[in-house]
Amino acid sequence: MNIKQLQILDAVVRFGSYRKAAAHLRCSQSTITFQLKNLENSLGCFLFEKAGRHMVLTPAGRTALKEAQKILASHSVLMNLKGSKSSLTGRLR
């Protein structure tokens, strides 16, 4: 499991399709499918199920999404620190 897979899960749910998520993330639809399949294998459960022509989250998928969003929020905070100049500055005497 990696951050990219969690971003893909979040994007698929947010945009409602693999195609739109792929466009947003600037990757191919097959990359989306491959990465989600790898995430499902890592977690040992299915994240989506077909409902007619649409994909809907399974109960495990809803839990995974909720936790993924927490991780992505924390990741964003940490990445913002990377560029921050919050270290001590000034003149030493």
Role assignments for model-derived ranges:
Residues 24-25, 36, 43, 64:
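Core residues of bacterial helix-turn-helix
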Residues 8-12, 64:
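Short alpha-helical "packing" element that flanks the helix-turn-helix/winged-helix DNA-binding module
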Residues 17-18, 36, 50:
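Helix-turn-helix DNA-binding elements, focusing on the entry/boundary residues of the two helices
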Residues 82-93:
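Interdomain hinge and pocket-entrance segments immediately C-terminal to HTH DNA-binding domains
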Residues 12-26:
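Short helix-boundary/capping micro-motifs
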Residues 2-5, 29, 61:
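The N-cap/first-turn positions of alpha helices
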Residues 40-57:
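A short LG(V/I)-centered, amphipathic sequence patch enriched
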